[in-house]
UniProtKB/Swiss-Prot annotation:
The modification Phosphothreonine is found at residues 270, 275. It is found in: Membrane. The lineage of its organism: Eukaryota, Viridiplantae, Streptophyta, Embryophyta, Tracheophyta. This is Probable receptor-like protein kinase At5g20050. Its EC number is 2.7.11.1. It comes from the Eukaryota. ATP binds at residues 109-117, 131. Residues 55-452 are cytoplasmic. Belongs to the protein kinase superfamily. Ser/Thr protein kinase family. Residues 103-392 form the Protein kinase domain.
Length: 452
């Protein structure tokens, strides 16, 4: 705009000087005064023309310089973004940046108890998943847990925290920004009723892919338990929190319920939190939790991958036409003792005849070791990796009492009859009023604690 004004003023000035010369010629003829005025005017006209030429060249060079700086600035921002990725340093985003990246939070790709997840594209072209954590007390607790747990960890089988956005205002939600994982979560690939609900992906994961997912998740948990400065307990291991990348390799996500503990701590007491079917018995019995609680949840996930079904379901009893709880791990344990292990495998895998029976037996044995009632009997995740990769033989696990089933069945019966009862478990007697608040705990299991 300034250049345009300068050019207009210069043109008007030149025209004015030309008019002065013409007027002087008419009035003064060819006198000495005319030549003096003409000389001064011509000098001024030449000066204005020189000014325009110099200014034009200067503006052209300035535009080239600005363009080059802008290009270098973009490259610098991209390079800086790349360096932050390599270093694993989370970026603090403004809310406006996340709104722009997610198109006003319109692209919803997931929703659960800890928040909603939206797909987004950042200014540098990176595809991200933006998790919105809402609620004051719960949101703040989960936000701090998740940032503390994952900000400093880097592992190929753990989702990477790209950045975050927080506000001092209690009413504003908090955001966590993760790498976008294209094939969504494991549940829609192993449970038949999850693949047709409008979510991206969906289908039947092959046996080979399931086995690799088992190894990937084991490595992720082993890293959290043994290779970090503080032990990190995930405390919400389940198919919904296991994502699959473009090569169907597993990436563990959602650290909203995680807990950091010192390396010299063997177990800690904490409030019951998690998802039904994946909670270890020691958690329900208020004996304190440890990394072996994650091992238990992992074992349940293994069984669900093998069978293509949930660990807990309600089935109708033909005689009474009432529904009762059916616990898949108990069925697996029984079939293994009867040497009918192929009867529990996902029928879709049987139909395509791609299942190795020896691998099924190995995976079932590993899973049953992982869900032993006594946490000391469970292997740690490094041992699980050794067993899955064939470096350590897998022995047949001991028969299980399946404590969780007794707890669930007791509460299920009491809910329908209103009768108080004592649940007898080997070496353990639990009474409602004196030693254990069974009803409150089991009811929290039956209705999902974390409805995701």
């Amino acid at each position: 705009m300034e250049d345009k004004k300068a050019n207009i003023i210069a043109t008007i000035l030149i025209l004015a000087l030309v008019v002065v010369i013409i007027a002087a010629r008419v009035s003064l003829k060819l006198s000495k005064t005319f030549y003096l005025i003409a000389g001064v005017d011509i000098s001024l006209i030449l000066a204005v023309i020189c000014f325009l030429i110099i200014r034009s060249r200067y503006n052209k060079e300035r535009k080239l310089l600005v363009s080059r700086f802008a290009s270098e600035g973009r490259e610098l921002r991209i390079e800086y973004s790349f360096l932050r990725k390599v270093a694993g340093v989370p970026t603090k985003f403004k809310l406006e940046d996340l709104e722009e990246a997610t198109d006003g939070f319109r692209s919803l790709i997931g929703k659960g108890g800890s928040g909603s997840v939206f797909k987004g594209v950042l200014k540098d072209g990176s595809q991200v998943a933006v998790k919105r954590i809402e609620g004051e007390e719960k949101g703040e607790r989960e936000f701090r847990s998740e940032v503390a747990a994952i900000a400093s960890v880097q592992h190929k089988n753990l989702v990477r925290l790209y950045g975050y956005s927080s506000s001092t205002s209690a009413n504003r939600p908090r955001f966590l920004v993760y790498d976008y994982i294209v094939n969504s979560s494991l549940d829609i690939w192993i449970f038949p009723d999850r693949g047709n609900r409008g979510r991206s992906g969906g289908g039947c994961l092959s046996w080979e892919q399931r086995y690799q997912v088992a190894i990937d998740v084991a490595k992720a948990l082993a890293y959290l338990h043994h290779d970090c400065r503080s032990k990190i307990l995930h405390l919400d291991v389940k198919p919904e929190n296991i994502l699959l990348d473009e090569n169907f390799r597993a990436v563990v996500t959602d650290f909203g319920l995680s807990k950091l503990i010192a390396r010299d701590e063997s177990r800690v007491l904490t409030d019951i939190r998690g998802t039904r079917g994946y909670l270890a018995p020691e958690w329900l019995l208020e004996h304190g939790i440890s990394e072996k609680s994650d091992v238990y949840s992992y074992g349940i996930v293994l069984l669900e991958m093998i069978g293509g079904r949930r660990s807990i379901s309600r089935v109708e009893v033909k005689e009474t036409k009432k529904k009762k709880l059916e616990y898949f791990p108990r069925i697996v344990n029984q079939k293994m003792r009867e040497r009918k292990i192929m009867e529990i495998v996902d029928q879709r895998l049987i139909e395509v005849n791609e299942v190795d029976e020896e691998e099924v037996m190995k995976l079932v044995c590993v899973a049953l070791w992982c869900i032993q009632e006594k946490s000391k009997k469970r292997p740690d995740m490094t041992m699980v990796i050794e067993m899955l990769e064939g470096r350590v033989p897998v022995n047949e696990p001991p028969d299980s009492d399946v404590v969780v089933v007794d707890l669930l069945a007791a509460d299920d019966d009491d809910a329908s009859t209103g009768v108080r009862r004592v649940v007898n478990i080997p070496k353990l007697q639990i009474h409602r009023e004196r030693n254990f608040r069974l009803s409150s705990i089991c009811s929290s299991i039956i209705s999902p604690i974390s409805p995701r």
